[in-house]
């Protein structure tokens, strides 16, 4: 019979849990319907499988089974209530079911109803009771209790005895609900009349009240026949004994004792004491357990027969039973002893001896990093078998993890996400749950689970650098590997599988895919064509790395700059002079009367390459065996190195092979043949007048009508004029040098000896005004490091001028530019600075009383440490920088200046290959001497007449270049007698000669030792001085 009782108790604790209650009778057959869980919960049966309807594993029972598709709960095997729940008044089976999506948990209680399937039974089929004949009516004698495994109304209800006149039964109920019978003597016994009485003792249960048990209702068990009442019998034999007048007596009928559980065996429970006033054996009392004590109590307790000591003999467990009833009897040893009875009620005190237990019902193996906070990860329950505070459990989640515990229902908890997860920060978490009770001392249990974080495509690929500069040499092989870009993705799996590509763009009107390609797997870049630096120097494009993530792939970009590196793949092309129309060599005519330095032509070439690959060098490779011609290796100017031999046959032209070579690796070159035809006649003007020895630098083309005598006379006249001018120029130079040396002794050494300030300026007078100051320092030699040229800001309009001739490529130009110098001499230190002054006005002045440049020279001592420049005191920082400048100036210089090792000064010995010696020059200095003669002593004043010439008289004036910027800064300085000046130098005598005089000269070879201040040193020094104004020529010229 099946009884279905649906209490429909739906508990929705935070919307997760519900509870159902069913009843079923024991001993039902397999397949008996218990209830439809899905229907009772109002669930859609068609969606049970999709929502993952299932039972919690640790709540399953073999007695019941659940159809997961229909939600029907039925009996799987027969249920024996007495076997499952023993004597418990309530027998409930628990089943937990849940739905995964969304998570819903339901607790189902199935109460097993008892049926009257067990009759009462006595421990023994024959019971014997001995009663003294002296027993008085009303005396009670407890009988052995019957046992009925059924509970409730089906349990033992009553006892019956065969009707008689001597005895009756009084049924008593124990504290635990069990019933036992006491035999009551109704009238005195007479052993002599009847020594033995036999009756049938019957135990009757409560069956037969109806078809269902307590709380029965409609359902599967309706309509079953009522259950029959069951009985059990035993033969009761009463033996009448001889009388024993006194019965032992206990102090009290009931004793109550409390013991903590887990008390060790041998622990005293109580010391019982019963007294008997009789003497001898009739008064000697012995103790024993009563016949109706439970078997479990016999196992747990022990009683001493002689002393009445009741002690623990087993393990007490509060969780098994909180109370035990121990029945003890005492009787004397006399004949016909009548026992006395008492009850010991043992209450077991709970001890915190059970740690909490954690049981996980469901655990998700992986949770997505994109899961929202509050997502359920695991479900578990916690139980503690102890009671009260010892059974109250608290749970916590260890560690700093983005999860938290959420209490759901009774002792059920869920682990949910507390914050958004990031797999890149942690791809797995070990969650440790600790359950701790409130006992003293508290017990705890921990259990760990592993939760994996599944990846979400939330990271875009990133390149190792945002911009790649890739250098590719031109003329590369198409399809060659040029570079590899790389990107990384913090995701994993398909979300981190990258594919490289190039974004579409146009390069010179064509798609980038015609220039480069990329390997989509490894990011290798390949050139699809051979690059030409002359057509395309650089281009840029973007590469993209895209992952294979879903639902949406992410991408990252980087810029790639392809920089084409030039190769020397273009030979120089000669563009002038051009060959004839029929491919005949270019032709030039050379007057027989041409002077050395005559500009025959300028060879011009171009190179499509760049940098060193396009820097060209010109040379004569063949046809110049007599060294008649020389070629400027930089400009390509072809000039005569000496006069044409008079005996040269005009019909035999010179065939020169000109080579133009670049500086690439390997170098490439081109050649051209130039036919030079000798002609007689007058010389026509030719641009590019000689910077060599020619007087005015202008030569005449020959006149076809002129005769040989006119040419010969003109040559003789020029030779005589050149010799005369050279002699006069040399004589003037010697006189000037002697005068300068004398004035230097007078003006410099004397001033130093008197510790005065020496004022020298190439632009005007005033140099003697400061020499009148009194001397307070010791004499000191003047060294080159004691000279500093400084720029003057207050420049008047009448400086001295020195005209300088500068040679251009196609003519001669004269420029007048004047510079003022300030020579600062320091008597206290040999480290003095050399600085420029501003250029003076180009107008010429003869006023000897006025100082046009405003230049001053002051010596400084310990009391006056600063240098006065432009009317202001120089700072200490400037002094420090001046010391650094002096250090560089005083460094050991290279003997034989490297500047003269370049092919800047040419002579007739040069064949065009740079084989002339240093300082060689065949130039005529006639016109140069004439200019020098006009302005050479324009700086002298009235003081020079009285005291001798000072330094400013012989110091040369620097002349800047014309409006065009020169190709080389060394060509912007002019030294008389030299075609082009590679470097301006300072010459000084060795310091080993104590009597040697120091001078400031620019005339090339007059000193044995000379050194060059390199351009980089000068630029650095001038920058460190922090002058208020930096003229442009300081960055282009060298100084001595």
From Swiss-Prot:
Sugar-bearing residue positions: 273, 557
Extracellular side: 19-715
Stretch forming the signal peptide: 1-18
InterPro entries: Cadherin-like_dom, Cadherin-like_sf, Cadherin_C, Cadherin_CS, Cadherin_N, Protocadherin/Cadherin-CA
Primary site of residence: membrane
Cadherin domain sequence ranges: 19-122, 123-250, 251-358, 359-463, 464-574, 582-690
One GO cellular component term: glutamatergic synapse
Biased composition (Basic and acidic residues): 910-926
Organ and tissue specificity: Moderately expressed in all regions of the brain examined, as well as in testis and ovary, and low expression in all other tissues tested.
Side of membrane Cytoplasmic, spans: 737-1040
Residue intervals passing through the bilayer: 716-736
Composition-biased stretches (Gly residues): 207-223, 686-697
Cellular compartments annotated: Cell membrane
Membrane protein topology class: Single-pass type I membrane protein
Keywords: Calcium, Cell adhesion, Cell membrane, Glycoprotein, Membrane, Receptor, Repeat, Signal, Transmembrane, Transmembrane helix
Superkingdom per UniProt: Eukaryota
BP-aspect Gene Ontology terms: cell adhesion; homophilic cell adhesion via plasma membrane adhesion molecules; nervous system development
Region (Disordered): 207-228, 686-708, 899-927
Record PANTHER family: CADHERIN-87A, PROTOCADHERIN-10
Protein name: Protocadherin-10
Organism field: Homo sapiens
Classification lineage: Eukaryota, Metazoa, Chordata, Craniata, Vertebrata
Gene name, Swiss-Prot/TrEMBL: PCDH10
């Amino acid at each position: 019979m099946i009884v279905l009782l649906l209490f429909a108790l739906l508990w929705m604790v935070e919307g997760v849990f519900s509870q159902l209650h069913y009843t079923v009778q024991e001993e039902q057959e397999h397949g008996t319907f218990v209830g439809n869980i899905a229907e009772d919960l109002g669930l859609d049966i068609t969606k049970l499988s999709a929502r993952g309807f299932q039972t919690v594993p640790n709540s399953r029972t073999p007695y019941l089974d659940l159809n997961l598709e229909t939600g029907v709960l039925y009996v799987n095997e027969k249920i024996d209530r007495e076997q499952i729940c023993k004597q418990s008044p309530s027998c409930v089976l628990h089943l937990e079911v849940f739905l995964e999506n969304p998570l819903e948990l339901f607790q189902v209680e199935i109460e097993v109803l008892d049926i009257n399937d067990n009759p009462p039974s006595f421990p023994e089929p024959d019971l014997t009771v001995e009663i003294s004949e002296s027993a008085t009516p009303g005396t009670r004698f407890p009988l052995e209790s019957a046992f009925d495994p059924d509970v409730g109304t089906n349990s033992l209800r009553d006892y019956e005895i065969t009707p008689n006149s001597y005895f009756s039964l009084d049924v008593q109920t124990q504290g635990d609900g069990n019933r036992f019978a006491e035999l009551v003597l109704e009238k005195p016994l007479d052993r002599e009349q009847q020594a033995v009485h036999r009756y049938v003792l019957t135990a009757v249960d409560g069956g037969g009240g109806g078809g269902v048990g307590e709380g029965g209702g409609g359902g599967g068990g309706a309509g079953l026949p009522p259950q029959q009442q069951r009985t059990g019998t035993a033969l009761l034999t009463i033996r009448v004994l001889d009388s024993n007048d006194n019965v032992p007596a206990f102090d009290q009928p009931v004793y109550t004792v409390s013991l903590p559980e887990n008390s060790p065996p041998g622990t005293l429970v109580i010391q019982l004491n019963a007294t008997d006033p009789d003497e001898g054996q009739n008064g000697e009392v012995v103790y024993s357990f009563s016949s109706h004590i439970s078997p479990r109590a016999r196992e747990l307790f022990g009683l001493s027969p002689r002393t009445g000591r009741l002690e623990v003999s087993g393990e007490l467990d509060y969780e098994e039973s909180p109370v035990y009833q121990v029945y003890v009897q005492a009787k004397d040893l006399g004949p016909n002893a009548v026992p006395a009875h008492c009850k010991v009620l043992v209450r077991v005190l709970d001890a915190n001896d059970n740690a909490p237990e954690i049981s996980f019902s469901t655990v998700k193996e992986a949770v997505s990093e994109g899961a929202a906070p509050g997502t359920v990860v695991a479900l578990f329950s916690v139980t503690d078998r102890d009671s009260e505070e010892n059974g109250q459990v608290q749970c916590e989640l260890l560690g700093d993890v983005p999860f938290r515990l959420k209490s759901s229902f009774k002792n059920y908890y869920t682990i949910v996400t507390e914050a958004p997860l990031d797999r890149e920060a942690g791809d797995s978490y070990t969650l440790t749950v600790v359950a701790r009770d409130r006992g003293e001392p508290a017990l705890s249990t921990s259990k760990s689970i592993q939760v994996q974080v599944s990846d979400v495509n939330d990271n875009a690929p990133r390149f190792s650098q945002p911009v790649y500069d890739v250098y590719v040499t031109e003329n590369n092989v198409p399809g060659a590997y040029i570079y590899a870009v790389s990107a990384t993705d913090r995701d994993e799996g398909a979300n981190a599988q990258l594919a490289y590509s190039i974004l579409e763009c146009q390069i010179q009107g064509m798609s980038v895919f015609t220039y480069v390609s990329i390997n989509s797997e490894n990011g290798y870049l390949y050139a699809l064509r051979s690059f030409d630096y002359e057509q395309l120097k650089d281009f840029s494009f973007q590469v993209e790395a895209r992952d294979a993530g879903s639902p949406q792939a992410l991408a990252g970009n980087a810029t790639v700059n392809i920089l084409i590196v030039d190769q020397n793949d273009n030979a120089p092309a000669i563009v002038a002079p051009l060959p004839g129309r029929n491919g005949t060599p270019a032709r030039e005519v050379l007057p027989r009367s041409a002077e050395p330095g005559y500009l025959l032509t300028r060879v011009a070439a171009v190179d499509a390459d760049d940098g060193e690959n396009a820097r060209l060098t010109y040379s004569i490779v063949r046809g110049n065996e007599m060294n008649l011609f020389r070629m400027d290796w930089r400009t390509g100017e072809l000039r005569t190195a000496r006069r044409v031999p008079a005996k040269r046959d005009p019909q035999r032209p010179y065939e020169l092979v000109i080579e133009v070579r670049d500086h690439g690796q390997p170098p490439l070159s081109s050649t051209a043949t130039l036919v030079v035809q000798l002609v007689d006649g007058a010389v026509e003007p030719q641009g590019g007048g000689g910077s060599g020895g020619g007087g005015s630098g202008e030569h005449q083309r020959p006149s076809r009508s002129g005769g040989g005598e006119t040419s010969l006379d003109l040559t003789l006249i020029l030779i005589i004029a050149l010799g005369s001018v050279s002699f006069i120029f040399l004589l003037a130079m010697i006189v000037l040098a002697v005068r300068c040396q004398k004035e230097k002794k007078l003006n410099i050494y004397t001033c130093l000896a008197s510790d005065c300030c020496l004022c020298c300026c190439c632009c005007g007078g005033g140099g003697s005004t400061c020499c009148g100051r009194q001397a307070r320092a010791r004499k000191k030699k003047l060294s080159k490091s004691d000279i500093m040229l400084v720029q003057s800001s207050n420049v008047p309009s009448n400086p001295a001028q020195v005209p300088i001739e500068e040679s251009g490529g196609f003519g001669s130009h004269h420029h007048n530019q004047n510079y003022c110098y300030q020579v600062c001499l320091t008597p206290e230190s040999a480290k003095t600075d050399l600085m420029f002054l501003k250029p003076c006005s180009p107008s010429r002045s003869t006023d000897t009383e006025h100082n046009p440049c405003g230049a001053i020279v002051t010596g400084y001592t310990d009391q006056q440490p600063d240098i006065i420049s432009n009317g202001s005191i120089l700072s200490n920082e400037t002094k420090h920088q001046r010391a650094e400048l002096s250090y560089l100036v005083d460094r050991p210089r290279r003997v034989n200046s490297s500047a003269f090792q370049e092919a800047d000064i040419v002579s007739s010995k040069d064949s065009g290959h740079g084989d002339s010696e240093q300082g060689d020059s065949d130039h005529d200095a006639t016109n140069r001497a004439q200019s020098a003669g006009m302005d050479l002593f324009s700086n002298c004043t009235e003081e020079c007449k009285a005291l001798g010439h000072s330094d400013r008289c012989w110091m040369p004036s620097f002349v800047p270049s014309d409006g065009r910027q020169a190709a080389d800064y060394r060509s912007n300085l002019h030294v008389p007698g030299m075609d082009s000046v590679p470097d301006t130098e300072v010459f000084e005598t060795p310091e080993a000669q104590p009597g040697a005089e120091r001078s400031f000269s620019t005339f090339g070879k007059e000193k044995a030792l000379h050194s060059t201040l390199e351009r980089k040193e000068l630029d650095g020094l001038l920058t460190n001085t922090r002058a208020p104004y930096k003229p442009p020529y300081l960055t282009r010229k060298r100084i001595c």
